[in-house]
Amino acid sequence: MGLHESQDSTIYELIEFILDDLIQFINVTELGKEIFPIATFFDKNDIIRTLMEEKIDFYSRSVDNKVIVNFDEDIFRYLINLEEFDINAEDKNGNTLLHAAIDQGKSEVVKFLTSYKNLEVNTKDLGGNSPLHLAIKSNNPEIVEMLLSYENINVNEKDKYGDTTLHKAIRSYNHKIIEMLLLREEIDVNEKDNQGETPLHGAVKSNRPEIVKMLLSHKNMDTKQKEIFSFLEISREDEAKTPINDGVSILGASEAESYGESLHNKDASSYSL
């Protein structure tokens, strides 16, 4: 056994000794708040259960939410139901329980948390990501669906780069997630990021014609964008090489939009599409 393992074992034995033999002689509240972080560090759920059984006040906000969401279910539920427990509190890393559960892929924890009416579902972490942003980045349609069912969810929330949930969904290439977002009445399909690009730009840049068509068919798509990009898609798919086709092949999405707009303002009948 190495020195580090020996120290770990000694600390663990000391905690057990305190709980078994000295608990009646000390301030149990202060004890609990000291032991809880140590027990979580050593992943000793049995010690935490002893604190629970002895009805010792042990909860401490010093423990990261990513640790809390990985507790066994009985411990997690015990903590959540404590009067002093704030379900929306951020840890030192800026993560709420919801952020942490999504990051860890804990769909059952997300389901449990979204059953609370006071859950703040749009809180951003230090990176500017809402829980819905994280679920989309994680490519997890199950959790995305849970979040979308929550009453106050904001599907147009932006991160620090100006990306909406739809911008992120386009990058995920997950059709199911994109479809779920496009079905939302309040979704803004024309919102621009900090670079001035819409989700449609992203789909064109990524060469995802099937996603481009999904966006173009949306009832709220900006008419100007719809006309320009529909015009470009026709030229891109046409086997005959036309001036428009060549332009779309050579230029990037941003330049292609400008190129398409200039052509669109001319008499398109002069080109064989």
From Swiss-Prot:
The keyword Repeat applies. ANK repeats lie at residues 31-60, 93-123, 127-157, 161-191, 195-225. The keyword Repeat applies. Keywords: ANK repeat, Repeat. InterPro entries: Ankyrin_rpt, Ankyrin_rpt-contain_sf, Multifunctional_regulatory. Coiled coil: none annotated. This is Putative ankyrin repeat protein RBE_0317.
